[in-house]
Design a protein with these regions (language model features):
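Signature (C-motif/LSGGQ) region and adjacent switch/coupling loops
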Residues: 9, 45-48
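Conserved ABC ATPase "signature" region
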Residues: 13, 17-20, 24-44, 96
Length: 168
């Protein structure tokens, strides 16, 4: 959730100030600008959330997270509110950032295409309030991943079929 009274730059800086309190103003500014540039928002740093599309707002959230250089990043349905094209574009951006920054990520998602594209392992949960781990599926695609190459590989569809059959 973005702070509506703050620009994209300010929203990212909010966390950076707290995580890097001893960094100089110039160093913190460089961290923020680099994070926003990495998600394609170099020209939108001074925009407020009300001036941004849902996809742009999601990019600011991603920039805010990666600017903090976490060892573990938890993403809970990060692309759920987005249209299909924006979702795919942001998945590509996210995958590029995670590969480059080497951030371990735990992704919660109900989108089987998304988990096959982004994840190395899928932990499938059983139904119900007392849910447990039902099965773990390893996704054996090389990194860096390319969506068009994966879509031509029979392994991609075997993984999808396996996930869907577990869910049904």
């Amino acid at each position: 959730c973005l702070m509506p009274w703050s620009t994209a730059y300010g929203n990212v800086m909010l966390g950076v100030k707290n995580v890097y309190p001893h960094a100089s103003r110039a160093e913190r500014s460089q961290i923020v600008e680099s994070a926003l540039s990495s998600v394609g928002l170099a020209d939108s740093m001074e925009k407020y959330p009300r001036e941004m599309s849902g996809g742009m707002q999601q990019r600011v959230g991603i920039a805010r997270a990666i600017a903090l250089k976490p060892k573990l990043l938890l993403l809970d349905e990060p692309f759920g509110r987005l249209d299909s094209l924006t979702r795919m574009e942001l998945q590509d951006v996210m995958l590029d950032i995670l590969n480059r920054e080497q951030i371990t990520t735990m992704l919660v998602s109900h989108d089987v295409d998304e988990v096959v594209f982004l994840c190395d392992r899928v932990v499938m949960m059983t139904n119900g309030p007392a849910a447990t781990i039902g099965e773990i599926l390893t996704i054996d695609f090389e990194r860096p991943r390319d969506r068009s190459t994966m879509l031509q590989d029979p392994l991609y569809f075997r993984c999808l079929d396996h996930l869907v059959s577990f869910l049904t």
